[in-house]
């Protein structure tokens, strides 16, 4: 069960819905990153519901290593394990795997690397990634792709694109096999293919054209937001977008700042994820409608205003900047929890405002009014 419905369009920006076995996602949407099946900062799944999270994103590699995907399967899959009723997306593990692997350990069959926990040698290829994600029983599984370092030579990027295409074919075949097994927890698991090609426009376009032929449930643009200038990222999105199936959701992986999201939406992207809101919060950097504030600055010690006077989140309704700064400085867990809750609310509310603007036909105006204020670095 997977159906993307385009409700409205303003320029290339899309307002739609994406139906899954675990509920309907209103797009554009931000997926909240729960690497080890939990948000870093002490938020529960109930908290996520209250702050408007639609999709939780979990990490295949980390859950494979600890507690183990077999254990999660025995517990009924990620939804029962975490008591999260809404959609879950699992990444393929590729990004972590390739950061741990040496170049000469990357073969056609897959990748050999060592666990960051105990040093144990692990092999992962397309079939293994699909098997792990099937055990996790996520709503959406990401295809296993090669995450090439940026910059990469043109020739290597071309070889990598071709290999990632072959791996996607294997991922699709393995998922079809797994979804047909009688003991598979989620027989309606969806598969998203991933576009690669570094910052080479022709490789990106060729690769997108080829993976689109495989009729996946959705498509992602990967390998960006890894140090390249923002202008390169925007150029690649614009180059690839015309070749992305219009009837499938589009996901920009690992992005990004509020400004990046606004630019991505304007170029036709539906889904985003990033560790930035939770990571920044844990270091006292909090998002507001007027930009980021750094609670580490001494000027906030006696500040009795909420983090953002324009925000209606549970944190801003009750607590002051001065109090949250004190908690963070004292190392109190509550400080991290409140900061993370605010930042994730900010991101989820940003997406709700974007959807409302698209509904009203006023997205261009919304973007122009807010993009200058937001951190667009």
Language model features: what each stretch is:
Residues 1-185, 298-301:
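Non-catalytic, usually N-terminal nucleic-acid engagement modules in DNA/RNA processing proteins
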Residues 23, 56, 91, 133, ...:
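Conserved, mostly hydrophobic/aromatic
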Residues 23, 164-171, 211, 240, ...:
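Hydrophobic alpha-helical packing residues
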Residues 138, 169, 173-176, 242-245, ...:
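Generic secondary-structure signature for well-ordered alpha-helical cores
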Residues 162-165, 174, 178-180, 186-307:
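Glycine-rich phosphate/ribose-binding loops and adjacent secondary-structure elements
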